[in-house]
Amino acid sequence: RPAPFLIHQESNVIVRAFRDYLRQDIGEILIDNPKVLELARQHIAALGRPDFSSKIKLYTGEIPLFSHYQIESQIESAFQREVRLPSGGSIVIDSTEALTAIDINSARATRGGDIEETAFNTNLEAADEIARQLRLRDLGGLIVIDFIDMTPVRHQRAVENRLREAVRQDRARIQISHISRFGLLEMSRQRLSPSLGESSHHVCPRCSGTGTVRDNESLSLSILRLIEEEALKENTQEVHAIVPVPIASYLLNEKRSAVNAIETRQDGVRCVIVPNDQMETPHYHVLRVRKGEETPTLSYMLPKL
């Protein structure tokens, strides 16, 4: 056959859903589109599962299907770093290159008459929610869970068993260790596909994925040192610092004397601070202009990088 031609095509979302999630304990399958309903019944027939045919039903309610069953809120929770628990506690999920860390906080949890009982109940709730979030986010690899400290060993074993029971319906292979003396539980989950974060998020262009940026004062001082380094080089005529507006304000006001001192020490070197309203911290650009190079006389005519 002449190239190019199709070698393989992944099944559509209906086929994949039935293939991956069809289980005997499913009570009904609701579909809000008649055409999709017919395709689903055809696929069930092709699978030789007539027992599921009667479970496939057309949803005709006026409220959208996902809103009626509060699925939208569950989907949104999969995109949140913090997930609330029924008792008022929460779990915080952070993924790194090496592992996924999950921290349980009692926060406003008030159930129970003492701290130990509150910790135990919150950890039980967290075990159920963690199992659900692992499936929703399709998190794989090494996962470390920091449970709230519990003194009785029986409580630790109960939380471990609750987690094992909660992940039974997960189609990925899962291994779970015991809670250590530091309150940490390590587990691994088979990576079936890219996680929700990998497939639907991109790295923040401002912080480059770190989650934090340097404050204005710290960054300004760093840029000031870099300006001085460039000014010290031989044959330097000018040093241009193209920076965000807050950084320019700090350098031109709080550090005006320091900029003037650099120009005084390096006789003949001109330091030019150019505010760029399109630039955000921590981004900046310091440019050294050698003697003899042509540059615009006016700073506002400098290119905005």
Report residues per predicted region:
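DE-rich acidic low-complexity regions and acidic surface loops
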Residues: 1-305
